């Protein structure tokens, strides 16, 4: 009987440790940010993120194919016309990072930018 009690106690402790590690020590669920891309802008065109917090950017094109490249954060998306694409990443440095449309979308293509502010 004592042996069964010790085994149950040991298993309970292992389960508790596993549960604690997965909820406390693991990363938080990613924050989802929805963007809209249309000639020749992103909406919103500025986003503030926290360093070390995982993010999912979901970008929907309202018209033609677009892209989103943020070189410093290793984001490079191709968004089909009237479609959606997403990128998951965790910012590992602070600063202001400019993303640009990486798929030619018309005469205003060069001005299609978004700024991600990453703070502590």
Segments predicted by a language model, with ranges:
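Bacterial N-terminal signal peptides
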Residues: 8-18
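Exposed beta-strand and adjacent loop surfaces of beta-rich binding modules
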Residues: 30-32, 54, 65-67, 96, ...
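N-terminal post-signal-peptidase region of extra-cytosolic proteins
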Residues: 37-45, 70-74, 82-86, 99-100
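N-terminal, post-signal-peptide region of Sec/Tat-exported proteins
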Residues: 48-83
């Amino acid at each position: 009987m004592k042996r069964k009690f010790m085994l149950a106690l040991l298993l309970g402790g292992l389960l508790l440790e596993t549960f604690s590690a997965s909820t406390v020590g693991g990363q938080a669920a990613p924050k989802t940010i929805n963007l809209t891309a249309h000639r020749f802008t992103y909406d919103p065109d500025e986003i503030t993120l926290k360093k070390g917090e995982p993010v999912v950017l979901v970008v929907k094109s309202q018209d033609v194919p677009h892209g989103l490249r943020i070189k410093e954060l290793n984001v490079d998306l191709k968004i089909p016309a009237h479609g959606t694409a997403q990128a998951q990443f965790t910012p590992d440095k602070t600063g202001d990072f400019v993303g640009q449309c990486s798929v030619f979308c018309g005469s205003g293509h060069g001005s299609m930018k978004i700024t991600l502010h990453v703070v502590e």
